[in-house]
Amino acid sequence: MKLQVAIDRVPMERAMEIVKNITSEANIIEIGTSLTKEFDMRALRPVIEAAEGVAVLGDIKTCDEGKYEFDLGYRCGFSYLTVMGSASMGTLEACAHSAAEHDGLMMIDLLECDETRIERISGFTDAIYCLHTSTDEGSTADPVAQVRAFKTRFPQIQHLAIAGGIKKHHLAALSQENIDIVIMGSAITKADDIAMACRACRKEMK
């Protein structure tokens, strides 16, 4: 299980500081939607470069114009990009093709997708599907139960991530559930000592 640390709602300078504090422990650094909207993808290249070889995900939440947005994101240096599960099949297919062309990775955000929708879009075998409880909704009460229920319902989906209010005490149990990525944000990025918080979370995953 990989640890993805999400950076959101901070100035560019603070984003750079956070990146430098987590590169030794995070497996994936997420440049959150708020930053991609405020600064645009091209302007975020210095932040990507500060990651020093750690994979960087751009949480661009593509809904349309899949090829254009994904091509741009990969050219800017992102390794992973996100598309909404609610996007059209045409958009999802365009994003998948772009990911293949650029040797990139696609994450499908399942925010507000019901079971019928998930079933319909479950055929992207190289994609990572992200169980996502929104910031506005609040945190997931039991992420382990959520993962187990999802895997029982959709055994055909082989690559899974989870996001939304994940805390350090969830990690040991989640690491036993054979998921690809756990995504954490403020539990790490708002800590007094970000590097120490990230290190402590990694230890819980072993």
Which residues does each predicted region cover?
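Conserved N-terminal beta1-alpha1 strand-loop-helix module at the mouth
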Residues: 1-67, 75, 119, 189-190, ...
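Conserved anion-binding
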Residues: 3, 65-157
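Glycine-rich beta-to-alpha transition loops that act as phosphate-gripper elements at the mouths
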Residues: 8-9, 58-67, 109-114, 159-169
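Structural motif
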Residues: 24, 76, 124, 176-178
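Hydrophobic residues within beta-strands of alpha/beta enzymes
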Residues: 29, 81, 129, 182-183
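Short secondary-structure boundary segments
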Residues: 33, 85, 110-111, 133-134, ...
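A C-terminal functional module that forms or caps the active site or interfaces directly
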Residues: 54, 144-177, 181-188
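C-terminal helical cap(s) of enzyme catalytic domains, especially alpha/beta-barrels
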Residues: 95, 99, 175-176, 184-206
